[in-house]
């Protein structure tokens, strides 16, 4: 992904610190050697086979390095939050990081460019079958409630954790289903000044587990947990108070801090679509592998996996259809860039915007940042941050999301087109409603909402924020 979308997927140095005169763990060094072979050397080998040099991949100029041992001073330089613990050294290795919402939206935009039809706020109600074969789905417009049939030569169920809810008739009573075993992962965000990091840090969390503390979108991201999720509601996954305590305790213990729930900028949880194995393993011990299966109806289901493997999973599904239909259509997505990177210095300037805003827009939208800035230039108000003294996300991005990215609610704009609600949850979901109303009013101009609809949208967002649990609570503070 760093090759296909260099503006969206960024290199992230990761640190495993050592303290009190310890030498870095040799067993970890062995593991990192294996990581180098599987990731670094594999990527370099592919570039060599393709005749590529570092820096010629769609504007990407990064090639991963093998891990190395670093001194304590460099650990502190990369992770100032560790200064109080006086690290003596550590391992440094490389991973990558993205804003998943922007990656998904960019992939959808590219799909549209190749002829796909993408629709927000449409539910898949049930599979449509004819003579035992899947021939489409019954869909529902969430806003109007209208149901309609979408006919298709091939039906692919790529609904993630919801995959078991779209079944052909032959499987309705199958005792072997569901195949999905949901696992909840919880994250918290902190102000960078409260836990300053320039690079990522692996944090021991007890019982042989580890979590991560990472610089993310101008804040610090801490996560993740990995627990069985047995509730039926998959639409709103709320962080458990105990999980928030777990993350805070591990962070405070490792960084010698005294952070509380009041210091958390935002919290969120998601559900992984793990493949059920039929044994009582904890979710953390279940493989993250992807699985594709086809039933007698002809419907193909692709599930499991993770964000890192999303393109390969899509290839698996389409390759199966191509093979089944005896067509000659080799996959090309390994060579198709996602969006178009742009240097922030090439973006047009809008009066009043700080220089950091251009860097953020270039990293978030690529070349389309020019279109966002054109919206910002329409009025001084749109060039202002959504949250005063908060993240740099602009009100113009809200309008852009409604105009070009099918955002249909305040939640769409603040939770699923940007991450501002997860970085400044108390401000965005505050009782004074000022931020939510400001966003709703900006969207109203684009979507034709009247005053009553604006009020309803503000209420709806605050209800959604509560259901998603973005304002963190601690069980110890309850």
Task: Enumerate the language-model features and the residues they cover.
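Residues that recognize and position ribonucleotide moieties
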Residues: 68, 117, 148, 181, ...
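Long, low-complexity intrinsically disordered regulatory segments of eukaryotic signaling proteins
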Residues: 3-6
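A structural signal for short hydrophobic beta-strand segments in well-ordered beta-sheet cores
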Residues: 124-127, 212-213, 292
């Amino acid at each position: 992904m760093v090759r296909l979308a260099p503006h969206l997927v960024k290199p992230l140095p990761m640190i495993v610190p050592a303290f009190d005169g310890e030498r870095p763990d040799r067993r970890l060094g062995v593991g990192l050697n294996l990581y180098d072979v599987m990731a670094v050397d594999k990527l370099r080998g592919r570039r060599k086979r393709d005749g590529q040099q570092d820096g010629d991949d769609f504007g990407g100029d990064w090639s991963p390095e093998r891990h190395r041992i670093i001194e304590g001073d460099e650990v502190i330089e990369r992770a100032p939050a560790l200064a109080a613990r006086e690290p003596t050294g550590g391992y440094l290795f490389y991973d990558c990081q993205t804003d998943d919402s922007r990656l998904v939206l960019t992939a959808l935009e590219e799909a549209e460019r190749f002829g796909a039809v993408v629709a927000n706020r449409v539910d898949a109600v049930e599979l449509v079958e004819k003579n035992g074969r899947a021939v489409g789905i019954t869909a529902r417009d969430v806003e109007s409630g209208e149901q309609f049939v979408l006919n298709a030569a091939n039906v692919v169920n790529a609904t993630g954790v919801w995959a078991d809810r779209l079944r052909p008739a032959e499987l309705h009573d199958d005792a072997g289903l569901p195949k999905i075993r949901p696992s909840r992962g919880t994250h918290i965000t902190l102000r960078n000044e409260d836990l300053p990091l320039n690079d990522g840090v692996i944090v021991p969390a007890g019982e042989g587990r580890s979590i991560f503390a990472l610089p993310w979108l101008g804040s610090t991201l801490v996560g993740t947990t990995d627990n069985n999720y047995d509730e039926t509601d998959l639409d709103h996954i709320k962080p458990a108070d105990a999980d928030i305590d777990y993350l805070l305790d591990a962070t405070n213990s490792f960084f010698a801090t005294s952070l509380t729930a009041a210091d958390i900028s935002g919290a969120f949880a998601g559900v992984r679509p793990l493949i059920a194995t039929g044994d009582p393993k904890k979710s953390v011990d279940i493989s993250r592998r992807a699985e594709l299966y086809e039933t007698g109806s002809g419907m193909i289901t692709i599930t499991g996996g993770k964000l890192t493997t999303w393109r390969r999973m899509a290839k698996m599904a389409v390759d199966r259809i191509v093979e089944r239909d005896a067509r000659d259509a080799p996959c090309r997505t390994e060579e198709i860039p996602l969006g178009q990177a742009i240097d922030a210095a090439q973006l047009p300037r809008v009066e009043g915007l700080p220089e950091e805003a251009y860097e953020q827009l270039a990293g978030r939208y690529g070349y389309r940042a020019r279109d966002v800035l054109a919206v910002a230039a329409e009025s001084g108000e749109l060039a202002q941050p959504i949250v005063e003294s908060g993240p740099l996300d602009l009100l113009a991005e809200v309008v852009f999301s409604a105009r070009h990215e099918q955002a249909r609610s305040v939640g769409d704009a603040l939770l699923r087109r940007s991450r501002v609600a997860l970085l400044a949850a108390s401000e965005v979901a505050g009782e004074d409603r000022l931020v939510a109303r400001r966003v709703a009013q900006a969207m109203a101009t684009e979507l034709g909402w009247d005053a009553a609809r604006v009020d309803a949208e503000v209420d709806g967002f605050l209800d959604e924020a509560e259901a998603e649990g973005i304002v963190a609570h601690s069980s110890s503070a309850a």
